[in-house]
UniProtKB/Swiss-Prot annotation:
It comes from Daucus carota (Wild carrot). It is found in: Cytoplasm. The gene is 179B. PROSITE patterns: RIBOSOMAL_S2_1, RIBOSOMAL_S2_2. It holds the Pfam family Ribosomal_S2. This is Small ribosomal subunit protein uS2. Component of the small ribosomal subunit. Mature ribosomes consist of a small (40S) and a large (60S) subunit. The 40S subunit contains about 33 different proteins and 1 molecule of RNA (18S). The 60S subunit contains about 49 different proteins and 3 molecules of RNA (25S, 5.8S and 5S). Interacts with ribosomal protein S21. GO terms for cellular component: cytosolic small ribosomal subunit. Keywords: Cytoplasm, Ribonucleoprotein, Ribosomal protein.
């Protein structure tokens, strides 16, 4: 009885989390194979998904994942940008192989490709966006698990989990719940105990937010200590050079001493002010042959 109450409380907590992440919000269109999972339709035309059936399908998918011995035989793939971070985190904690981004055609069918693989299970985010791997998995008899919205095609999907596969919070919440259920069934996490990994790690983050977070996490350096450090090349290094490294030819200083007898008078010095111009030098007397007076003047 206690285990049933604990399971019921866990289910209620998971459903509340899915409601907060808007997992229950579908689209205005509904595929005929998804009508069994629809709870009701709002006045604005949006279909509401029954989260009780979503939780049951998550448990079924977790049992299928645990039944595979080697986790590397499981491929988790998402071409939708909102699901790429969640796919990588899911693969990190469960040991599966993640493919985040565009699917290379022929990965499951062309044996000549270097990226060829034959997985035992394929987990996808959106059957409409990931239509190529679904078709290749059908050709290779690979079972497929996919998160299906109300308008998603169910062809070639073996286990369809009804949920909102277009919101970044919804996709992260679904992969977090699936990873926690897998770890609980493997015995890594005890039943009824809280998983220490937060669901926020599975959410999509904008590149600008990631860059700002990395800049905030950088430690602030002590620049004052760097300036107070010893100078490059201390004073002892200048005297440490031996004299043998210098050349043998020593340049003698020029003899600049001039005897006092050879000094000459310098020219006139300029005025005290900067704007005062120096007086031109007076020319010396020039010897001219002047005739002697004759008395007629």
């Amino acid at each position: 009885m206690a285990s049933g109450a604990r399971e019921l409380s866990t289910m209620e907590a998971d459903i509340q989390m899915m409601c907060a992440a808007e997992v229950h919000l579908g689209t205005k269109n509904c595929d005929f194979q998804m009508e069994r999972y629809v709870f009701k339709r709002r006045n604005d035309g949006i279909y509401i998904i029954n989260l009780g059936k979503t939780w049951e399908k998550l448990m079924l998918a977790a049992r299928v994942i645990v039944s595979i011995e080697n986790p590397q035989d499981i491929i988790v793939q998402s071409a939708r940008p909102y699901g790429q971070r969640a796919v990588l985190k899911f693969a990190q904690y469960t040991g599966a192989h993640a493919i985040a981004g565009r699917h290379t055609p022929g990965t499951f069918t062309n044996q000549l490709q270097t990226s060829f693989s034959e997985p035992r299970l394929l987990i996808l985010t959106d059957p409409r966006t990931d239509h190529q791997p679904i078709k290749e998995a059908a050709l290779g008899n690979i079972p497929t698990i996919a998160f299906c919205d109300t308008d998603s095609p169910m062809r070639y999907v073996d286990i369809g989990i009804p949920a909102n596969n277009k919101g970044k919070h919804s996709i992260g919440c679904l992969f977090w719940l699936l990873a926690r259920m897998v770890l609980q069934m493997r015995g890594v996490i005890s039943q009824g105990h809280k998983w220490e990994v937060m669901v926020d790690l599975f959410f999509y983050r904008e590149p600008e937010e990631t860059k700002d977070q990395e800049e905030e996490d950088l430690p602030v350096g002590d620049y004052v200590a760097d300036y107070a450090a010893a100078p490059i090349g201390g004073a002892d290094q200048w005297n440490a050079i031996p004299d043998a490294q210098w050349g043998g030819d020593v340049v003698q200083p020029a003899n600049s001493a001039v005897p006092a007898g050879t000094w000459t008078d310098a020219g006139p010095i300029a005025g005290d002010g900067w704007d005062a111009a120096a007086a031109p030098p007076v020319p010396g007397a020039v010897g001219l042959d002047v005739p002697a007076p004759t008395g007629w003047e």
